[in-house]
C-alpha cells in the first residue's frame, strides 16, 4: 500500500512540476479542444504549402518572376478588399462557423476547376499567344498586363492561392482559436498549436519532393497524359482536395464538441455570436483604434518585407532551376528545412513568451528577417565580385551561393513567422471585445497583408512599367533600401504595441 501511495505521490509531483509545465503545459481535460484545433491547423497549412509551391513554381517558370508584383498589386489587393466587404456582410447573417465552411468550400471548388478544367484546356480558355506578342510590340509599357491577360487562369489560381493563407488560416482559423481559447490558456496553447500544426512543413516538403519525381502512387490515374506539368498539377490538386475535406470534417467536429459545449445552446438560430453591426459602423471602430493600427503595421511590415525579397529570390531560383519540376522540388526542400527550424523555434518560442513576455517573442521575427534579408541583398548586388568566395567554398558559380542564401533567408523568415509572429500577433486580439476581435481582425489581417504586399509591389510595378525590359537584378539596390526602412518601422511598431498590450492585460 505504501508503494502504491509512494508511486502516486511521485506521479502527482511529476505532473505538477515546473519542468512538466515548461515541456508540456496542456492539461488532460483540455485535449478535447487542443487536439482537433491542432489537426485543423495541420491540414489547413498542408494545403497552404502545397498550393504555394504550385502557384510559385508554375507562374515563375511558365510566365516570369517579374509578373508577381503586377499580380499582387492589381489582383490580390482588389480581391482582399472585396473579401473584407463580403466577409463582414456574411458575419451579419450567418454564424462564424457557417462562414468558415462556405469560404473553405469555395476555395476547394475553384482549385478543382483549375486543376481539372482550366489548366488542361488552357489553349481553349486563353487568348492566342501570337496576338499577345503583337499587342506587346504596339504597347510595350503594358507588357506585363498583356502577359497576365494571356495567362489569366494561372494568374487567378495564384491570387486564390495567396488568399488561402490570409483568409482561411490567418483570419478564419485564428478567429476560431480566439473564440474558444481563454486568456489564461493562450500563452500555453498558441505556441503548441504552432509546434504541432507546423509539423506539416516536414510532411508537405516531403510530399512535394515525392510528387516532383517521375514515379508516385497517383501516376496510374494520369498515365494517359503527356504533359508533365499537367500530371504534376492534377496530382497535387487531388491531395489538396482530400486535405480540404478533412479540414471541413474537423471544423464540424470542433463546432459540435467545443463551440456548442461552451455555449450550451441547443439550436444554432439562438447563437449569440452573430454580429449585427453594419460595415460602416465596424470601419469607424477600426479606423479610430490606435491599437489596431499598430497590429496592422506589424502585418504590413511582414508582408512588405517578404514581397521585396521574394521576386528577386525566385528569379535567381529560376535561373538555377528553369524546369517546373526542378523548381518545385527545390521548393519542397526549402519547405522541409523550414519545418525543421519551425519545430525548434516553436518549442523555444513557447517558453520564451511565457518566461520573458510578449515583447521578446514578437521582436525576434523582424530581427531575423533583417539580418538574413540584408545578407541576401548584399550577395545579389555584389554577385560579380564573389568569384574568390565561390571558389573558396567550392561552389560552381555565384548563382549557387546566392540561391542558397535566399533559401536560408526563406527558412529563417518563415520559421520565426510561423512559430512566433503568428502566435504573438493573435495574442494581442484576445483582450479586445467581440466586434473588434471579429471584424477588426478581418480588416487588419486581410487588408494589412494586402496593403503591405501592394506597397512593395508598387515599387516593382513602376520600375517594370517604365522599363519594360528590366529584371529584378536591375532594381536590387532600390529594394534593399526600402527593405531596411520597413524593418526599422517594424521594430518601432513592436515596441509601441507591447506597451499597449501590457496595459490592456493589466486591466
Curated annotation (Swiss-Prot):
Function field: Provides the rickettsial cell with host ATP in exchange for rickettsial ADP. This is an obligate exchange system. This energy acquiring activity is an important component of rickettsial parasitism.
InterPro entries: ADP_ATP_car_bac_type
Similarity comment: Belongs to the ADP/ATP translocase tlc family.
Superkingdom per UniProt: Bacteria
Name of the gene: tlcB
Main subcellular location: membrane
Listed NCBIfam families: AAA
Membrane spanning residue stretches: 31-51, 67-87, 99-119, 130-150, 154-174, 192-212, 231-251, 292-312, 333-353, 357-377, 393-413, 451-471, 474-494
Disulfide bonds: none
Location of this chain's protein in the cell: Cell membrane
Keywords, comma-separated and alphabetical: ATP-binding, Cell membrane, Membrane, Nucleotide-binding, Transmembrane, Transmembrane helix, Transport
Membrane topology reported for the UniProt record: Multi-pass membrane protein
Pfam families attached to this UniProt entry: TLC (PF03219)
Keyword flag Membrane: yes
Signal peptide stretch: none
Molecular function GO terms recorded: ATP binding; ATP:ADP antiporter activity
GO cellular component, as recorded: plasma membrane
Name listed for the protein in its UniProt record: ADP,ATP carrier protein 2
Amino acid at each position: 500500500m505504501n508503494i502504491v501511495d509512494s508511486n502516486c505521490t511521485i506521479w502527482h509531483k511529476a505532473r505538477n512540476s515546473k519542468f512538466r509545465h515548461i515541456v508540456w503545459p496542456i492539461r488532460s481535460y483540455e485535449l478535447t479542444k487542443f487536439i482537433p484545433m491542432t489537426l485543423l491547423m495541420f491540414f489547413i497549412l498542408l494545403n497552404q504549402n502545397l498550393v504555394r509551391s504550385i502557384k510559385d513554381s508554375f507562374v515563375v517558370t511558365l510566365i516570369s518572376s517579374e509578373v508577381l508584383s503586377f499580380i499582387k498589386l492589381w489582383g490580390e489587393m482588389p480581391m482582399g478588399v472585396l473579401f473584407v466587404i463580403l466577409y463582414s456582410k456574411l458575419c451579419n447573417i450567418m454564424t462564424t462557423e457557417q462562414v468558415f465552411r462556405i469560404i473553405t468550400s469555395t476555395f476547394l471548388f475553384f482549385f478543382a476547376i483549375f486543376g481539372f478544367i482550366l489548366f488542361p484546356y488552357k489553349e481553349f480558355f486563353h487568348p492566342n499567344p501570337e496576338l499577345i506578342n503583337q499587342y506587346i510590340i504596339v504597347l510595350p509599357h503594358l507588357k506585363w498586363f498583356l502577359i497576365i491577360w494571356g495567362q489569366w487562369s494561372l494568374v487567378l489560381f495564384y491570387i486564390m492561392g495567396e488568399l488561402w493563407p490570409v483568409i482561411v488560416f490567418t483570419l478564419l482559423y485564428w478567429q476560431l482559436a480566439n473564440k474558444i481559447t481563454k486568456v489564461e490558456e493562450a500563452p500555453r496553447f498558441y505556441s503548441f498549436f504552432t509546434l504541432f500544426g507546423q509539423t506539416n512543413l516536414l510532411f508537405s516538403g516531403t510530399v512535394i519532393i515525392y510528387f516532383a519525381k517521375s514515379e508516385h502512387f497517383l501516376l496510374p490515374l494520369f498515365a494517359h497524359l503527356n504533359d508533365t506539368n499537367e500530371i504534376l498539377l492534377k496530382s497535387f490538386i487531388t491531395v489538396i482536395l482530400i486535405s480540404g475535406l478533412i479540414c471541413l470534417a474537423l471544423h464540424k467536429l470542433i463546432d459540435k464538441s467545443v463551440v456548442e459545449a461552451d455555449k450550451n445552446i441547443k439550436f444554432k438560430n439562438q447563437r449569440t455570436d452573430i454580429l449585427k453591426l453594419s460595415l460602416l459602423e465596424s470601419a469607424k471602430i477600426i479606423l479610430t483604434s490606435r491599437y489596431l493600427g499598430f497590429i496592422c503595421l506589424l502585418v504590413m511590415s511582414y508582408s512588405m518585407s517578404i514581397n521585396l525579397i521574394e521576386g528577386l529570390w525566385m528569379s535567381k531560383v529560376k535561373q538555377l532551376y528553369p524546369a517546373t519540376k526542378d523548381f518545385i522540388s527545390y521548393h519542397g526542400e526549402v519547405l522541409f528545412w523550414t519545418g525543421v527550424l519551425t519545430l525548434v523555434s516553436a518549442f523555444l518560442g513557447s517558453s520564451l513568451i511565457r518566461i520573458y513576455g510578449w515583447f521578446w517573442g514578437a521582436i525576434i521575427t523582424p530581427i531575423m528577417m533583417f539580418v538574413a534579408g540584408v545578407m541576401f541583398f548584399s550577395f545579389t548586388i555584389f554577385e560579380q565580385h564573389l568569384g574568390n568566395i565561390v571558389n573558396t567554398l567550392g561552389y560552381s558559380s555565384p548563382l549557387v551561393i546566392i540561391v542558397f542564401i535566399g533559401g536560408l533567408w526563406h527558412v529563417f523568415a518563415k520559421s520565426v513567422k510561423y512559430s512566433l509572429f503568428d502566435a504573438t500577433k493573435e495574442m494581442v486580439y484576445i483582450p479586445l471585445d467581440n466586434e473588434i476581435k471579429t471584424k477588426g481582425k478581418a480588416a487588419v489581417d486581410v487588408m494589412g497583408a494586402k496593403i503591405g504586399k501592394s506597397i512593395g509591389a508598387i515599387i516593382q510595378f513602376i520600375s517594370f512599367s517604365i522599363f519594360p525590359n528590366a529584371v529584378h537584378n536591375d532594381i536590387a539596390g532600390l529594394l534593399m533600401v526600402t527593405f531596411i526602412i520597413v524593418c526599422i518601422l517594424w521594430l518601432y511598431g513592436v515596441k509601441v504595441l507591447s506597451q499597449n498590450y501590457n496595459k490592456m492585460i493589466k486591466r
